[in-house]
Amino acid sequence: MSGQSLTDRITAAQHSVTGSAVSKTVCKATTHEIMGPKKKHLDYLIQCTNEMNVNIPQLADSLFERTTNSSWVVVFKSLITTHHLMVYGNERFIQYLASRNTLFNLSNFLDKSGLQGYDMSTFIRRYSRYLNEKAVSYRQVAFDFTKVKRGADGVMRTMNTEKLLKTVPIIQNQMDALLDFNVNSNELTNGVINAAFMLLFKDAIRLFAAYNEGIINLLEKYFDMKKNQCKEGLDIYKKFLTRMTRISEFLKVAEQVGIDRGDIPDLSQAPSSLLDALEQHLASLEGKKIKDSTAASRATTLSNAVSSLASTGLSLTKVDEREKQAALEEEQARLKALKEQRLKELAKKPHTSLTTAASPVSTSAGGIMTAPAIDIFSTPSSSNSTSKLPNDLLDLQQPTFHPSVHPMSTASQVASTWGDPFSATVDAVDDAIPSLNPFLTKSSGDVHLSISSDVSTFTTRTPTHEMFVGFTPSPVAQPHPSAGLNVDFESVFGNKSTNVIVDSGGFDELGGLLKPTVASQNQNLPVAKLPPSKLVSDDLDSSLANLVGNLGIGNGTTKNDVNWSQPGEKKLTGGSNWQPKVAPTTAWNAATMAPPVMAYPATTPTGMIGYGIPPQMGSVPVMTQPTLIYSQPVMRPPNPFGPVSGAQIQFM
């Protein structure tokens, strides 16, 4: 069972909802479980510090927030996580910590929840002090002593005297804070403090290696220093001897808790004669009496001390290199294990062969395709056999003759059957379009049908300018004339044809409009009756008659008898014999019109009175209606064949 508390799970869930993966991982790494932070969480946070799009201050603030918890486990694990990121994370993290004024304010931390809380609170206060000192050291020298280059050409070995005397005390302060942790093997009783001790142990080795190289550089330059510098140098060396004793005790504790002996360096102390030589040199600079000593003896003592310190530094370096090598071997072992696991997974999968049998899907598909596919876009081959036109598919027409046409595709024949103008040539289409004008008269016998199978003669001209588009050119019976109005335009215009032969070969130049339809005697289809309320039918005569009757010309009064031979009584609506009447200039004796419904003022502009009305004369008085209630705007009538609807002017 996991040792995570309910509070840890709730906190992690809250960060999951907010979408902060970094904060969630911080909570996972600092749970109430009494064990060190898990490696997967630490590795994730380390990778986050290497990503440029990760907010480092937010990560640090999340860790600082966890240190405010009352549980010693959460606080201790927060410090361990921070220390781990400072050592193995990107340098940006420690740079941010060094730029902060305050870090961990845990000098008064105390967990009173239990006896173990009291004991661990002491180490938490010491541990937080070391981390604060580590950040301060980076702020002062702008680099981490545990990561500097070491060796003969290292940072501490090549540093000048002035900078060296300022840098070594900083290392001493950080070393003091580390050694103040002062833990015994009996106190390393849980996984949390053990994880902290391992980080401190690695820091102690690297920090003491830098410290040792700084002392070697100091001893090499000691006899060439000024009096004040020699005094500072002697004080630094004495402190170094004290720290060496304490670091030896720290390493003994590490050996007791089970750390490998090969990972613990051997510390070789310098001979005691070196300290006497340094003191005598300082006394000589101060003018005091000293024992007689030759330069050769001083050089021998100095060389022995440097060699012993160099061996210590070499041991520390070997430990560090051994640690790096162990880390590399661990990574290689993990990579090898992953490769072996991958190979096992691939070996378990069956090998697929390229020469496999046909799939059942393709086999079934081959069985279904019993008929060859038809390409509707391909050009059909010519055939000598004459196929019957498909116009009698629904038995709509009974052709009386079959025109001699070129063999065409089925789609073209169907289109020609229903009067598709695209199936004809350009000349035929151009010849058919003017016939759609109701003012032009042309005998149906003059139309020559010309059908070509050449696709290149296709024209984009479409009969969109027809007056009544979209009506089905199906044969219908001659509609009965209305009882109110009996108009025969064909007899009036003089171009009525009695013998009209309908071309059933598949082409109708007018689409069934503007021509009377003659039903064949062989047709057995039921006659489609036009509903009485239909305003527009397939025949122009009945359509115009219905429109004129529904418009209610003449104040809505229905005229039962219309005599077209009385031009003086009515106006002609059109035709080839229609002539506009010119009003006489001597007298205004017009026919009596309907009673006026409105009056026009004398200031009405010319041409605004009505359609087809002459302009108002200034000398003719206009009779107005005294009972006028409102003025109605005059609009142009939508029917050009009828009289103007609305108000009329009556002249006296």
From Swiss-Prot:
GO molecular function terms noted in the UniProt entry: 1-phosphatidylinositol binding; amyloid-beta binding; cadherin binding; clathrin binding; clathrin heavy chain binding; low-density lipoprotein particle receptor binding; phosphatidylinositol-4,5-bisphosphate binding; small GTPase binding
Keyword Cell membrane recorded: yes
Region of interest (Disordered), residue spans: 559-580
Chain spans, region Interaction with PIMREG: 221-294
SMART domains noted in UniProt: ENTH
Site, Breakpoint for translocation to form CALM/MLLT10 fusion protein: residue positions: Q648, I649
Positions bearing N-acetylserine: S2
Tissues where the protein occurs: Expressed in all tissues examined.
Signal sequence range: none
UniProt keyword list: Acetylation, Cell membrane, Chromosomal rearrangement, Coated pit, Cytoplasmic vesicle, Endocytosis, Golgi apparatus, Isopeptide bond, Membrane, Nucleus, Phosphoprotein, Proto-oncogene, Ubl conjugation
Positions of post-translational Phosphoserine modification: S16, S20, S303, S315
PANTHER family: CLATHRIN ASSEMBLY PROTEIN (PTHR22951), PHOSPHATIDYLINOSITOL-BINDING CLATHRIN ASSEMBLY PROTEIN (PTHR22951:SF16)
Disease (UniProt): A chromosomal aberration involving PICALM is found in diffuse histiocytic lymphomas. Translocation t(10;11)(p13;q14) with MLLT10.
Family: Belongs to the PICALM/SNAP91 family.
Complex and partners: Binds to clathrin; involves primarily the C-terminal sequences, but the full-length protein is required for full binding capacity. Binds phosphatidylinositol 4,5- bisphosphate. Interacts with PIMREG; this interaction may change the subcellular location into the nucleus. Interacts with AP2A1 (via its alpha-appendage domain). Interacts (via N-terminus) with VAMP2; VAMP3; VAMP7 and VAMP8 (Via N-terminus). Interacts with LC3/MAP1LC3A.
Name of the protein in its database record: Phosphatidylinositol-binding clathrin assembly protein
Originating species: Homo sapiens
Organism taxonomic ancestry: Eukaryota, Metazoa, Chordata, Craniata, Vertebrata
